[in-house]
Regions:
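Soluble catalytic domains of membrane acyltransferases
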Residues: 47-164
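Membrane-proximal helical "anchor" segments flanking the first transmembrane region
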Residues: 1-77, 84-85
């Protein structure tokens, strides 16, 4: 895992921080890989983590906001940054989220790894939806008046989209 997509990571950091020196970029890159390894280990931990332990690690500072959202009797979309163990958003169920939860994910080409990721991310009351299936599911739930919560990563770029 060390050195994963090294050129892409370096290129993205140079685009994001044009004012930084090569040394500073290298330091940020090292911190990225440390964080990336932490995320991988936390994803593995998610396979066996209990709801109680998950709630200790994923703290909602304003659970009353979940109640307010649900009181509107509308489905909602929760946008997440592609940061830390965003899979742990499943803990919202333990904070009183009663809507059926859907996690949107990009299907992985390796069938075994795709099944593993789906199993990990759907452990705590979440149904995983491949990106291409989201519009159909939203329309079906709306037609059936089925209130739902959709979790999506907000900061991923479509293939081929690069800042210039």
């Amino acid at each position: 895992m060390v050195g994963y997509r090294k050129n892409v990571v370096k290129s993205n950091l140079e685009l994001a921080f044009p004012e930084k020196s090569k040394k500073e970029i290298h330091q940020i890159q090292k911190k990225f890989y440390h964080h990336f390894c932490d995320m991988f280990l936390e994803m593995v931990k998610t396979m066996s983590i209990s709801g109680t332990a998950l709630k200790k690690r994923f703290v909602v500072k304003n659970p009353e906001e979940l109640e307010r959202l649900q009181s509107l009797d509308k489905s909602h979309i929760i946008l997440l940054g592609h940061y830390a163990s965003y899979e742990w958003v499943n803990a919202l169920h333990f904070y009183g989220l009663t809507y059926e939860a859907y996690g949107v994910y990009k299907k992985i080409k390796n069938r075994y790894f795709d099944c593993l990721i789906k199993r990990i991310r759907s452990k705590h009351h979440t149904t995983m939806l491949a990106t291409k299936d989201v519009p159909k599911q939203i329309l079906r739930n709306k037609k059936d008046q089925h209130l739902s919560s959709y979790g999506m990563i907000a900061d991923q770029a479509p293939k081929g989209a690069h800042a210039k």
